[in-house]
Protein backbone atom coordinates (compact mmCIF):
# COMPACT_ATOMS: atom_id res chain seq x y z
CA UNK A 1 0.00 0.00 0.00
CA UNK A 2 2.83 2.44 0.83
CA UNK A 3 1.84 5.96 1.73
CA UNK A 4 -0.43 6.87 -1.13
CA UNK A 5 -1.91 10.34 -0.93
CA UNK A 6 -5.70 10.83 -0.88
CA UNK A 7 -7.20 14.34 -1.04
CA UNK A 8 -10.77 15.03 0.09
CA UNK A 9 -12.71 18.04 -1.18
CA UNK A 10 -15.93 19.32 0.34
CA UNK A 11 -18.01 22.41 0.99
CA UNK A 12 -17.91 24.22 4.37
CA UNK A 13 -21.12 22.75 5.83
CA UNK A 14 -21.59 20.32 8.74
CA UNK A 15 -24.10 18.25 6.77
CA UNK A 16 -21.44 17.51 4.15
CA UNK A 17 -18.25 17.33 6.23
CA UNK A 18 -19.54 15.31 9.21
CA UNK A 19 -20.40 12.19 7.12
CA UNK A 20 -16.80 12.06 5.87
CA UNK A 21 -14.98 12.25 9.23
CA UNK A 22 -15.12 8.56 10.22
CA UNK A 23 -14.15 7.59 6.66
CA UNK A 24 -11.22 10.02 6.79
CA UNK A 25 -10.05 8.53 10.11
CA UNK A 26 -10.31 5.01 8.69
CA UNK A 27 -8.17 5.89 5.67
CA UNK A 28 -5.54 7.46 7.93
CA UNK A 29 -5.48 4.35 10.15
CA UNK A 30 -4.93 2.20 7.04
CA UNK A 31 -1.72 4.07 6.33
CA UNK A 32 -2.80 6.59 3.72
CA UNK A 33 -1.68 10.17 3.82
CA UNK A 34 -4.92 12.16 3.73
CA UNK A 35 -5.16 15.89 3.09
CA UNK A 36 -8.45 17.75 3.50
CA UNK A 37 -8.85 21.43 2.53
CA UNK A 38 -11.27 23.15 4.94
CA UNK A 39 -12.20 26.58 6.21
CA UNK A 40 -11.18 27.65 9.73
CA UNK A 41 -14.40 26.31 11.29
CA UNK A 42 -13.59 22.69 10.40
CA UNK A 43 -9.83 22.53 11.06
CA UNK A 44 -10.24 20.96 14.51
CA UNK A 45 -12.70 18.31 13.23
CA UNK A 46 -10.28 17.23 10.49
CA UNK A 47 -7.29 17.26 12.86
CA UNK A 48 -9.12 14.79 15.11
CA UNK A 49 -9.25 12.27 12.25
CA UNK A 50 -5.46 12.32 11.87
CA UNK A 51 -5.71 13.87 8.40
CA UNK A 52 -3.88 17.05 7.44
CA UNK A 53 -6.21 20.07 7.18
CA UNK A 54 -5.24 22.58 4.50
CA UNK A 55 -6.75 26.02 4.91
CA UNK A 56 -8.64 27.78 2.13
CA UNK A 57 -11.04 30.71 1.77
CA UNK A 58 -14.66 30.19 0.77
CA UNK A 59 -17.29 32.61 -0.49
CA UNK A 60 -20.11 30.44 0.89
CA UNK A 61 -21.65 31.83 4.05
CA UNK A 62 -23.69 29.11 5.77
CA UNK A 63 -25.52 31.61 7.96
CA UNK A 64 -28.83 30.26 9.33
CA UNK A 65 -30.60 33.64 9.25
CA UNK A 66 -29.62 34.30 5.62
CA UNK A 67 -30.59 30.75 4.65
CA UNK A 68 -34.02 31.23 6.24
CA UNK A 69 -34.53 34.43 4.25
CA UNK A 70 -33.46 32.66 1.05
CA UNK A 71 -35.89 29.81 1.66
CA UNK A 72 -38.75 32.26 2.31
CA UNK A 73 -37.98 34.23 -0.86
CA UNK A 74 -37.91 31.68 -3.69
CA UNK A 75 -36.75 34.38 -6.16
CA UNK A 76 -33.46 34.63 -4.27
CA UNK A 77 -32.96 30.89 -4.79
CA UNK A 78 -32.47 31.60 -8.51
CA UNK A 79 -29.19 33.24 -7.53
CA UNK A 80 -27.77 29.89 -6.36
CA UNK A 81 -25.99 29.16 -9.70
CA UNK A 82 -24.17 32.51 -9.48
CA UNK A 83 -23.13 31.68 -5.91
CA UNK A 84 -21.62 28.39 -7.09
CA UNK A 85 -19.84 29.99 -10.06
CA UNK A 86 -18.35 32.58 -7.68
CA UNK A 87 -17.34 29.86 -5.19
CA UNK A 88 -15.62 27.70 -7.80
CA UNK A 89 -13.76 30.71 -9.21
CA UNK A 90 -12.53 31.50 -5.69
CA UNK A 91 -11.69 27.96 -4.59
CA UNK A 92 -10.24 26.29 -7.71
CA UNK A 93 -7.08 28.45 -7.93
CA UNK A 94 -6.46 27.91 -4.20
CA UNK A 95 -6.72 24.14 -4.60
CA UNK A 96 -4.45 24.21 -7.66
CA UNK A 97 -1.83 26.11 -5.64
CA UNK A 98 -2.13 23.71 -2.69
CA UNK A 99 -1.71 20.59 -4.85
CA UNK A 100 0.40 21.72 -7.82
CA UNK A 101 3.56 20.25 -6.27
CA UNK A 102 1.85 17.63 -4.12
CA UNK A 103 -0.53 15.84 -6.44
CA UNK A 104 -2.69 13.15 -4.77
CA UNK A 105 -3.02 9.59 -6.02
CA UNK A 106 -6.81 9.79 -5.62
CA UNK A 107 -9.39 12.53 -5.08
CA UNK A 108 -12.61 12.13 -3.10
CA UNK A 109 -15.13 14.92 -3.68
CA UNK A 110 -18.53 15.73 -2.26
CA UNK A 111 -21.07 15.96 -5.08
CA UNK A 112 -21.46 19.70 -4.39
CA UNK A 113 -17.69 20.36 -4.22
CA UNK A 114 -17.36 20.60 -7.98
CA UNK A 115 -13.96 22.29 -7.69
CA UNK A 116 -12.63 18.89 -6.58
CA UNK A 117 -14.01 17.24 -9.73
CA UNK A 118 -12.56 19.97 -11.94
CA UNK A 119 -9.16 19.66 -10.25
CA UNK A 120 -9.18 15.88 -10.79
CA UNK A 121 -9.87 16.45 -14.49
CA UNK A 122 -7.13 19.08 -14.77
CA UNK A 123 -4.51 16.90 -13.04
CA UNK A 124 -5.67 13.69 -14.76
CA UNK A 125 -6.36 12.00 -11.41
CA UNK A 126 -9.11 9.45 -10.75
CA UNK A 127 -11.89 10.66 -8.45
CA UNK A 128 -14.52 9.08 -6.21
CA UNK A 129 -17.80 10.92 -5.64
CA UNK A 130 -19.21 11.19 -2.10
CA UNK A 131 -23.00 11.49 -1.75
CA UNK A 132 -24.15 12.97 1.54
CA UNK A 133 -27.70 12.78 0.19
CA UNK A 134 -29.62 10.62 -2.32
CA UNK A 135 -27.92 8.99 -5.28
CA UNK A 136 -29.52 9.65 -8.66
CA UNK A 137 -29.96 7.62 -11.83
CA UNK A 138 -32.47 7.33 -14.68
CA UNK A 139 -35.11 6.05 -12.23
CA UNK A 140 -34.71 8.69 -9.51
CA UNK A 141 -33.57 12.29 -9.79
CA UNK A 142 -34.24 15.36 -7.68
CA UNK A 143 -35.28 17.21 -10.80
CA UNK A 144 -37.96 14.66 -11.68
CA UNK A 145 -39.77 15.11 -8.36
CA UNK A 146 -39.32 18.81 -7.64
CA UNK A 147 -39.24 21.85 -9.91
CA UNK A 148 -36.98 23.53 -7.35
CA UNK A 149 -34.08 21.27 -8.34
CA UNK A 150 -34.19 22.21 -12.02
CA UNK A 151 -31.25 24.50 -12.77
CA UNK A 152 -31.96 26.85 -15.65
CA UNK A 153 -29.38 29.60 -16.02
CA UNK A 154 -30.55 33.12 -16.79
CA UNK A 155 -28.78 34.98 -19.64
CA UNK A 156 -26.81 36.88 -16.97
CA UNK A 157 -25.70 33.61 -15.38
CA UNK A 158 -24.81 32.09 -18.77
CA UNK A 159 -22.60 35.14 -19.44
CA UNK A 160 -21.02 34.88 -15.99
CA UNK A 161 -20.15 31.23 -16.64
CA UNK A 162 -18.74 31.98 -20.11
CA UNK A 163 -16.60 34.80 -18.72
CA UNK A 164 -15.43 32.81 -15.70
CA UNK A 165 -12.06 31.13 -15.36
CA UNK A 166 -13.73 27.73 -15.19
CA UNK A 167 -13.14 25.00 -17.74
CA UNK A 168 -16.13 23.67 -19.65
CA UNK A 169 -18.36 23.34 -16.60
CA UNK A 170 -21.98 22.27 -16.75
CA UNK A 171 -24.30 22.35 -13.72
CA UNK A 172 -25.75 19.03 -14.86
CA UNK A 173 -22.35 17.54 -13.95
CA UNK A 174 -23.38 17.77 -10.30
CA UNK A 175 -25.81 14.92 -10.93
CA UNK A 176 -23.52 12.74 -13.03
CA UNK A 177 -22.20 9.59 -11.31
CA UNK A 178 -18.48 8.86 -11.13
CA UNK A 179 -16.85 5.44 -11.63
CA UNK A 180 -17.34 4.93 -7.87
CA UNK A 181 -20.00 6.71 -5.80
CA UNK A 182 -20.04 6.33 -2.01
CA UNK A 183 -23.57 6.96 -0.69
CA UNK A 184 -23.94 7.62 3.05
CA UNK A 185 -27.26 5.82 3.52
CA UNK A 186 -28.38 2.18 3.33
CA UNK A 187 -29.83 1.03 0.02
CA UNK A 188 -33.16 0.38 1.82
CA UNK A 189 -33.62 4.12 2.42
CA UNK A 190 -32.72 5.18 -1.13
CA UNK A 191 -35.78 5.57 -3.39
CA UNK A 192 -35.59 2.94 -6.17
CA UNK A 193 -32.50 1.60 -4.39
CA UNK A 194 -32.58 -1.71 -6.26
CA UNK A 195 -32.05 0.08 -9.61
CA UNK A 196 -28.56 1.41 -8.80
CA UNK A 197 -25.67 -0.53 -10.37
CA UNK A 198 -22.24 -1.55 -9.06
CA UNK A 199 -20.89 2.01 -9.40
CA UNK A 200 -22.92 2.92 -6.29
CA UNK A 201 -21.88 1.68 -2.86
CA UNK A 202 -24.55 2.34 -0.21
CA UNK A 203 -22.48 2.26 2.99
CA UNK A 204 -24.96 3.83 5.41
CA UNK A 205 -24.02 6.62 7.82
CA UNK A 206 -20.34 7.08 8.55
CA UNK A 207 -20.37 8.00 12.23
CA UNK A 208 -17.49 8.93 14.51
CA UNK A 209 -17.17 10.23 18.07
CA UNK A 210 -16.95 14.01 17.74
CA UNK A 211 -14.73 15.42 20.48
CA UNK A 212 -15.04 18.86 18.89
CA UNK A 213 -18.78 18.85 19.75
CA UNK A 214 -18.55 17.47 23.29
CA UNK A 215 -19.75 19.48 26.28
CA UNK A 216 -18.07 19.33 29.67
CA UNK A 217 -21.33 19.27 31.63
CA UNK A 218 -23.90 16.52 31.02
CA UNK A 219 -27.07 17.70 29.28
CA UNK A 220 -29.32 14.74 30.11
CA UNK A 221 -30.53 14.73 33.72
CA UNK A 222 -31.33 11.58 35.70
CA UNK A 223 -34.97 12.64 36.12
CA UNK A 224 -36.21 9.30 34.79
CA UNK A 225 -38.26 11.05 32.10
CA UNK A 226 -38.00 9.77 28.50
CA UNK A 227 -35.72 11.99 26.41
CA UNK A 228 -36.93 13.96 23.37
CA UNK A 229 -34.38 15.75 21.19
CA UNK A 230 -35.52 18.74 19.11
CA UNK A 231 -33.07 20.13 16.54
CA UNK A 232 -33.33 21.74 13.11
CA UNK A 233 -29.65 21.10 12.35
CA UNK A 234 -26.86 23.63 11.86
CA UNK A 235 -28.01 25.57 8.78
CA UNK A 236 -31.84 25.75 8.79
CA UNK A 237 -32.45 26.55 12.44
CA UNK A 238 -33.28 30.28 12.53
CA UNK A 239 -37.00 29.75 13.25
CA UNK A 240 -37.82 31.08 16.76
CA UNK A 241 -41.57 30.60 16.28
CA UNK A 242 -41.02 26.86 15.90
CA UNK A 243 -39.18 26.61 19.21
CA UNK A 244 -41.98 28.50 20.96
CA UNK A 245 -44.46 26.01 19.47
CA UNK A 246 -42.38 23.16 20.88
CA UNK A 247 -42.36 24.73 24.33
CA UNK A 248 -46.13 25.15 24.19
CA UNK A 249 -46.61 21.59 22.90
CA UNK A 250 -44.47 19.77 25.47
CA UNK A 251 -44.53 21.99 28.54
CA UNK A 252 -45.01 19.92 31.73
CA UNK A 253 -45.40 16.65 29.81
CA UNK A 254 -43.68 13.33 30.55
CA UNK A 255 -40.77 14.28 28.29
CA UNK A 256 -37.33 15.55 29.22
CA UNK A 257 -36.94 17.85 26.21
CA UNK A 258 -33.48 18.83 24.99
CA UNK A 259 -33.79 21.56 22.37
CA UNK A 260 -30.95 22.86 20.18
CA UNK A 261 -31.82 26.27 18.70
CA UNK A 262 -28.67 27.13 16.74
CA UNK A 263 -26.10 29.87 17.06
CA UNK A 264 -28.32 32.77 15.91
CA UNK A 265 -30.76 32.36 18.83
CA UNK A 266 -29.90 33.01 22.48
CA UNK A 267 -31.31 30.28 24.76
CA UNK A 268 -31.75 32.95 27.43
CA UNK A 269 -34.17 34.81 25.14
CA UNK A 270 -36.96 32.34 25.93
CA UNK A 271 -39.26 33.46 28.73
CA UNK A 272 -40.69 31.03 31.26
CA UNK A 273 -38.71 27.94 30.20
CA UNK A 274 -40.54 24.85 31.53
CA UNK A 275 -38.86 22.70 34.16
CA UNK A 276 -38.76 19.73 31.74
CA UNK A 277 -36.90 21.72 29.02
CA UNK A 278 -33.17 22.22 28.48
CA UNK A 279 -32.35 24.75 25.73
CA UNK A 280 -28.90 25.07 24.11
CA UNK A 281 -27.39 26.54 20.95
CA UNK A 282 -25.62 23.27 20.10
CA UNK A 283 -25.70 19.80 21.62
CA UNK A 284 -23.67 16.58 21.19
CA UNK A 285 -26.35 15.02 19.01
CA UNK A 286 -24.88 11.52 18.69
CA UNK A 287 -24.54 11.18 22.47
CA UNK A 288 -28.09 12.38 23.15
CA UNK A 289 -29.63 10.14 20.48
CA UNK A 290 -28.19 7.11 22.29
CA UNK A 291 -30.65 7.85 25.12
CA UNK A 292 -33.50 9.53 23.23
CA UNK A 293 -36.91 7.98 22.59
CA UNK A 294 -38.08 10.57 20.05
CA UNK A 295 -36.38 13.02 17.68
CA UNK A 296 -38.08 16.08 16.18
CA UNK A 297 -35.82 16.98 13.26
CA UNK A 298 -35.64 19.05 10.07
CA UNK A 299 -35.06 15.86 8.10
CA UNK A 300 -31.50 16.64 7.07
CA UNK A 301 -29.88 13.44 5.83
CA UNK A 302 -27.20 13.48 8.53
CA UNK A 303 -29.68 13.88 11.37
CA UNK A 304 -32.09 11.37 9.85
CA UNK A 305 -29.39 8.71 9.53
CA UNK A 306 -28.06 9.44 13.03
CA UNK A 307 -31.55 9.08 14.50
CA UNK A 308 -32.28 5.84 12.64
CA UNK A 309 -28.87 4.41 13.52
CA UNK A 310 -29.70 5.04 17.19
CA UNK A 311 -33.14 3.44 16.78
CA UNK A 312 -35.08 6.64 17.48
CA UNK A 313 -38.49 7.35 15.85
CA UNK A 314 -38.64 10.64 13.95
CA UNK A 315 -41.01 13.55 13.50
CA UNK A 316 -39.65 15.45 10.49
CA UNK A 317 -40.43 19.13 9.83
CA UNK A 318 -38.49 19.82 6.58
CA UNK A 319 -37.04 23.24 5.75
CA UNK A 320 -36.01 22.73 2.10
CA UNK A 321 -36.88 20.49 -0.89
CA UNK A 322 -34.30 17.75 -0.20
CA UNK A 323 -35.51 17.52 3.42
CA UNK A 324 -39.08 17.34 2.14
CA UNK A 325 -38.13 14.21 0.17
CA UNK A 326 -36.58 12.72 3.31
CA UNK A 327 -39.57 13.58 5.50
CA UNK A 328 -41.90 11.89 3.02
CA UNK A 329 -39.55 8.89 2.89
CA UNK A 330 -39.56 8.63 6.70
CA UNK A 331 -43.36 8.49 6.73
CA UNK A 332 -43.78 6.11 3.78
CA UNK A 333 -41.28 3.67 5.33
CA UNK A 334 -43.15 3.83 8.65
CA UNK A 335 -40.22 5.35 10.55
CA UNK A 336 -42.10 8.35 11.93
CA UNK A 337 -44.24 11.32 10.92
CA UNK A 338 -43.90 14.17 8.43
CA UNK A 339 -45.22 17.67 9.20
CA UNK A 340 -45.35 20.48 6.63
CA UNK A 341 -43.63 23.53 8.18
CA UNK A 342 -46.42 25.91 7.16
CA UNK A 343 -48.98 23.69 8.89
CA UNK A 344 -46.93 23.07 12.03
CA UNK A 345 -48.56 24.13 15.30
CA UNK A 346 -48.18 23.13 18.93
CA UNK A 347 -51.23 20.91 18.48
CA UNK A 348 -49.90 19.20 15.32
CA UNK A 349 -46.54 18.58 17.02
CA UNK A 350 -48.29 17.00 20.01
CA UNK A 351 -50.43 14.85 17.70
CA UNK A 352 -47.46 13.66 15.61
CA UNK A 353 -45.51 12.73 18.74
CA UNK A 354 -48.54 10.99 20.23
CA UNK A 355 -48.99 8.90 17.06
CA UNK A 356 -45.30 7.97 16.92
CA UNK A 357 -44.34 7.46 20.56
CA UNK A 358 -44.44 3.80 21.54
CA UNK A 359 -46.13 2.65 18.31
CA UNK A 360 -45.01 -1.00 17.95
CA UNK A 361 -45.24 -0.84 14.13
CA UNK A 362 -42.95 2.21 14.03
CA UNK A 363 -40.50 0.59 16.45
CA UNK A 364 -40.40 -2.58 14.32
CA UNK A 365 -39.69 -0.59 11.15
CA UNK A 366 -37.00 1.38 12.99
CA UNK A 367 -35.34 -1.85 14.15
CA UNK A 368 -35.42 -3.21 10.59
CA UNK A 369 -33.76 -0.03 9.29
CA UNK A 370 -31.14 -0.27 12.06
CA UNK A 371 -30.26 -3.72 10.71
CA UNK A 372 -29.94 -2.36 7.17
CA UNK A 373 -27.66 0.39 8.48
CA UNK A 374 -25.46 -2.08 10.36
CA UNK A 375 -25.23 -4.40 7.34
CA UNK A 376 -24.30 -1.47 5.05
CA UNK A 377 -20.89 -1.28 6.74
CA UNK A 378 -20.41 2.45 7.36
CA UNK A 379 -16.98 4.08 7.25
CA UNK A 380 -15.06 0.79 7.09
CA UNK A 381 -17.05 -0.41 4.08
CA UNK A 382 -16.49 2.95 2.38
CA UNK A 383 -12.74 2.68 3.04
CA UNK A 384 -12.74 -0.89 1.67
CA UNK A 385 -14.40 0.31 -1.55
CA UNK A 386 -11.94 3.18 -1.92
CA UNK A 387 -8.96 0.86 -1.31
CA UNK A 388 -10.24 -1.55 -3.95
CA UNK A 389 -10.67 1.36 -6.38
CA UNK A 390 -7.17 2.62 -5.60
CA UNK A 391 -5.67 -0.84 -6.21
CA UNK A 392 -3.96 -1.49 -9.58
CA UNK A 393 -7.25 -2.42 -11.27
CA UNK A 394 -8.69 0.99 -10.43
CA UNK A 395 -6.03 3.68 -10.20
CA UNK A 396 -2.86 2.95 -12.10
UniProtKB/Swiss-Prot annotation:
Protein name: NDP-glycosyltransferase YjiC
Keywords assigned: Glycosyltransferase, Transferase
Family to which the UniProt record says this protein belongs: Belongs to the UDP-glycosyltransferase family.
EC number: 2.4.1.384
Biotech uses: Such glycosyltransferases with substrate flexibility and less regioselectivity can be utilized for glucosylation of a broad range of pharmacologically and industrially important compounds. Glycosylation is an efficient tool for generating biologically potent and diverse novel natural and unnatural product glycoside compounds with enhanced drug efficacy. For instance, generation of novel resveratrol glycosides could facilitate the development of drugs to treat oxidative- stress-induced diseases and to provide antiaging functions.
Cross-referenced NCBIfam families: MGT
Function: Glycosyltransferase that can glycosylate a wide range of substrates, including various flavonoids (flavones, flavonols, flavanones, flavanols, chalcones), isoflavonoids and stilbenes, to produce multiple glycosylated products. It can accept diverse nucleotide diphosphate-D/L-sugars as donors, including ADP-, GDP-, CDP-, TDP- or UDP-alpha-D-glucose, and catalyzes O-, N-, or S-glycosylation. In vitro, catalyzes the glycosylation of, among others, apigenin, 3-hydroxyflavone, phloretin or resveratrol, resulting in multiple glucosylated products, along with mono-, di-, tri- and tetraglucosides.
Organism: Bacillus licheniformis (strain ATCC 14580 / DSM 13 / JCM 2505 / CCUG 7422 / NBRC 12200 / NCIMB 9375 / NCTC 10341 / NRRL NRS-1264 / Gibson 46)
GO molecular function per UniProt: hexosyltransferase activity; UDP-glycosyltransferase activity
Catalytic activity from the UniProt record: an NDP-glycose + an acceptor = a glycosylated acceptor + NDP
Gene name for this UniProt entry: yjiC
Coiled coil spans: none
Chain sites annotated for binding UDP: 18, 234, 283, 298, 302-306
SUPFAM superfamilies in the record: UDP-Glycosyltransferase/glycogen phosphorylase
Amino acid sequence: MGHKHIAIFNIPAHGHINPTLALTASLVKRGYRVTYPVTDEFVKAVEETGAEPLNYRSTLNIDPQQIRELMKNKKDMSQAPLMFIKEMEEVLPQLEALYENDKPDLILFDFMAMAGKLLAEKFGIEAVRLCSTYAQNEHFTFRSISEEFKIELTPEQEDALKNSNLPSFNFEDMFEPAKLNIVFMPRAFQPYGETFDERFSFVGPSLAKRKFQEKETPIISDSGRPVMLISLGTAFNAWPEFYHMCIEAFRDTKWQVIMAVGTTIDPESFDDIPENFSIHQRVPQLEILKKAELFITHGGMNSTMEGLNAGVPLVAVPQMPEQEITARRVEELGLGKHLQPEDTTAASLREAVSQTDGDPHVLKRIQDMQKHIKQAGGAEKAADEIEAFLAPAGVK
